[in-house]
C-alpha cells in the first residue's frame, strides 16, 4: 500500500474550561467545557497510533470563561499537557478566545507561538511586524501557511494601536449595536460577519501571502492555508466569516498552488469547492461535540491526492490533484 508523503492531525475550537457545561453566546448551543479536554486526549491517542508528523490546532484552544475566573494559565497548562503527549510539533492558529485570555504580546511570548517549529525548511514570517503569520514546507512539494485572522480586530490589538483604531472604524461602520458589538448588524446575509468576535487581514499580510503563493506557483508546490476564521461564504455561516474575506479569496484565486483553506470558528463546520478549484474546509468544533462523539481529523498527503479521515462529527474528504 502506498505510503503518504506527510501525515498531520487537525483539531479546532477545543475551548477548554474547568466549569460545568453551558451554552454559546446566543444561548442556542450546548457546550461541553470540561469534557473537551477528554476529547482532545482521545484525538492525541489516535494521532499517536497513526504516527502523525505534526498537528495543526486551528484556534480557540481554551475558552474565554477562563479569563473571568483568573484561570487562563491553568487551563492552558491543561490542554498543552494533552498536546505534549503527541511528541510531535503542534502548530497553533490564534482565534478570538486566545485574545479573550491573553494580550497579543503575551501570546507572542507564549507556547502558543509555534512559528519556530518549522523543521529544517523554515520559511518566512511576519512575527517581527507583530503579525502572527508564518509558512514552511513540511515535506517536498508541499507548503503550510498559517494566517493571523485577528491582525485587524478590536480584540486582537491593543487599544492605543493604529490597527485597533482602524479596526474599530471598520466594525462600527457596519455594526451600530454599540452596546454589544457581538450582536450582528443584520439577521441574515454576509453583513452578519461584522461582529466583535471576528476580525480580518491587513494589506501587509495579504501582500505577504500573495508573495508566498507566487513563489509556490513557481516551485509547483501544493499549499495548505490555515486560519481560525473561514473566508468562503459557502463553507461557513456568514456570522463566522472574516471581515475582508473577499480580499483573501481574491488572492487565493490568483494562484494555482492553493490546494485548500482550512479554518475553524464555525462549530458546525462546512465544506465547499471554490470556482478556482481550491477546497475550503471548516472543521467542526470540539466544544460543541457531545462526550460520546469526537471532532478531529487526520490528513494524509500523497503525490496525487489529500485524504482527510474524520472522526465523529468530522466527515471524510478526498481532494485529488495532478
From Swiss-Prot:
Keyword set includes Cell wall biogenesis/degradation: no
Gene3D superfamilies, per database record: 3.60.21.10
Disulfide links within the chain: none
A GO MF term: CDP-glycerol diphosphatase activity
UniProt xrefs under InterPro entries: Calcineurin-like_PHP_ApaH, Metallo-depent_PP-like, MPP_ADPRM
EC numbers for this chain: 3.6.1.13, 3.6.1.16, 3.6.1.53
Matching Pfam families: Metallophos
Positions of Zn(2+) 1 binding: 13, 15, 60, 267
UniProt-annotated binding residues for Zn(2+) 2: 60, 96, 228, 265
Entry cofactors: Mg(2+)
Keyword flag Plastid: no
Recorded catalytic activity of this chain's protein: CDP-choline + H2O = phosphocholine + CMP + 2 H(+); ADP-D-ribose + H2O = D-ribose 5-phosphate + AMP + 2 H(+); CDP-glycerol + H2O = sn-glycerol 3-phosphate + CMP + 2 H(+)
Keywords: Hydrolase, Metal-binding, Zinc
Family: Belongs to the ADPRibase-Mn family.
UniProt subunit comment: Monomer.
Function: Hydrolyzes ADP-ribose, IDP-ribose, CDP-glycerol, CDP-choline and CDP-ethanolamine, but not other non-reducing ADP-sugars or CDP-glucose.
Full protein name: Manganese-dependent ADP-ribose/CDP-alcohol diphosphatase
Species assigned in the record: Danio rerio
Lineage, broadest ranks: Eukaryota, Metazoa, Chordata, Craniata, Vertebrata
